[in-house]
Amino acid sequence: MEKSVLRKEMKLLRKSMDKNDRTAKDKKIFENLIKLDSFKSSSWFYVYVSYGTEADTKNLIEYLFELKKEREIHVAVPKVLGDEMEFFEINLFSELEKGCMGILEPSTGNKVKPENAFMVLPGLAFDEEHKRLGYGGGFYDKYLSKCGAERFMKVAVCYDFQMQKKGVIASDSNDIKVDMIVTDKAYY
């Protein structure tokens, strides 16, 4: 399937979700994510700030802020700078402001150097081979290529209907696969 067609289809499906259904699925994704051993053992978390109909990460970020009271962890979120993306450490939601395309980004803060980290990635579609179809800007692929994808436990979160059969998502040589996909129903 053509990437543009699949992107459009996934956006429409996410947009058509019932609010209560979305809330229940977001809760299940969160619960599934925090059960992971790799999550429990991490001290650095690179997390996208959900926007629009994306699987929610704001509750996850709030949870991480609470977790900071119990153990030393660091939370970093992305900021688009031109045609690239960098991650900045944050300690409070109030450190975010609307940035590129209206997405919440750090207003200030310390740009982080790539650490061995647990990274939560967004996307429109994924498959059983761990291919990821993003929004087309290549921000995550460029960042991971530049920093070394092996430094991160790359975990995508999505609704189960965003999972595709093997071979549906075309990939280019610069596309970086995720290590795991967590949905409201399963782990892939």
Label the predicted regions.
Residues 12, 110, 114-119, 128-131, ...:
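Surface-exposed, charge/polar-rich loops and edge strands
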